[in-house]
Amino acid sequence: MNAKDVISRLPDEVLGRILSLISTKEAVSTSVLSKRWKNMFVLVSNLDIDDRQSVPKTKQNRIEIHRNYMAFVDKLLDTQRGSSIKKLTLKSHVGVRGGTDSSRIQSWICNVLDHGVMDLDVFITLKGKSPPVPAMIFKSKTLVKLRVGRGFTIKLSQDVSLPLLRTLCLDSVNFVGGHNVVGTLISRCPVLEELVVEERRCVDWTCSVSSPSLKRLHIRFDRKFTSISLDAPNLIYYKHSGYVLGKYPNVKLDSLIEARLNLRMDETRMVGVRNGSLGSIPADMRNLINGIRNVRILHLSSHTLELLYFSCKEMPLFDSLVSLSIGNDKARGWQMLPLLIKNSPNLETLIFMGLDHYITNRCGDVCVCYDTDESITSCLSSSQVKVLEILSYQGTTRELNQMKHFLEKLPCLELVKICVVNNSNNLQTTMEMRNLMMLPRASSKCKIQVKVLTKNN
């Protein structure tokens, strides 16, 4: 008995699971093997249909690929009638203008909803008029995970209800029916645990996210939005990127463990604020910062750190903060860093993605941009930081002076981890490492670890 016969004699349920481990296209192709395999692929409950496997070279190719793609989906879903579909991933990236029949997309979605689908991922790059998401998608009693993008229109009916939905991702969709469509949708998801909203289309948009079950939240705005309020008492992970909003009226994230803020504003306006030609930034971040004050792990991009300086004159006490990482950008300053370190009495780990930053006399005593009065007690001297990590270390004189400042001022340091970028000059790299090892240290327990990375890494 050969290996093929052994596999063919396995129970249908086992064969269905095996076929679920390969791509849907490959699973369908097994139907030509023998009569035994002719309709075996209908046992596959996880369908993954993606046109990226075919790379179009010309417009004609794109049109043909798109037609074949739609015909394949039609045929596949037609053969699945009566079968269980647990997961459908439907992706098309060809983006032929006028080539996608929105009614067919809607029929595909309705088809799998009728099959009791639990995990639905529809990501189709559309050109032209945005088709609406079928209303029944927001009334599903079986959906546990839902991702919709890109270019669809969402309009909610009064009877929206997703009782089992735990993960929701909305990527570049159009919202119709008021400013707080997202908030309304979330309120109809009683067990929602993870929410991702990436919005690049709407302008003058406001949102209020209130959910006692939400644990993870990622929001990204690439346009100028108005405001967002957040009330998620059990949220443990929060990521906020894109444009900073004008207002954060209410932010309550009392259980937060980790936060990542990567916010920016128009560069022209930022330059004006920095040089004094503009009075202030059109954003009030005070409620946002107060709302995350219980966080334990905080990641701030260099843009965010500078925005905080121009938006917040005061900083709350971060009693629970144990790890802080700062982004790297030579065009952004560290003006807010002294106050942030001072107001983090239990900070143990301080991470810099790089030491390059905008030279200013407002960085206080945390850096060596300008000579500081030695009689002034540094915020570093009272810090409890035990681990200092520096990434992308280039070994410049300015960086070496900054490292000297850190080592002389941080009294509780136990470990310094430095990632040196190798410039292909082994002798220079060796000298950089030697210079680092010879620096004086305020802490007798301080050890320095140096890791050398080549630029290819």
Swiss-Prot record:
LRR repeat residue intervals: 265-288, 292-315, 318-343
Keyword Repeat: yes
UniProt keyword terms in alphabetical order: Leucine-rich repeat, Repeat
Designated name of the protein: F-box/LRR-repeat protein At2g42730
Pfam families for this protein: F-box, LRR_At5g56370
InterPro entries: F-box-like_dom_sf, F-box_AtFBL13-like, F-box_dom, FBD, FBL60-like, LRR_FXL15/At3g58940/PEG3-like
SMART domains reported for this sequence: FBD (SM00579)
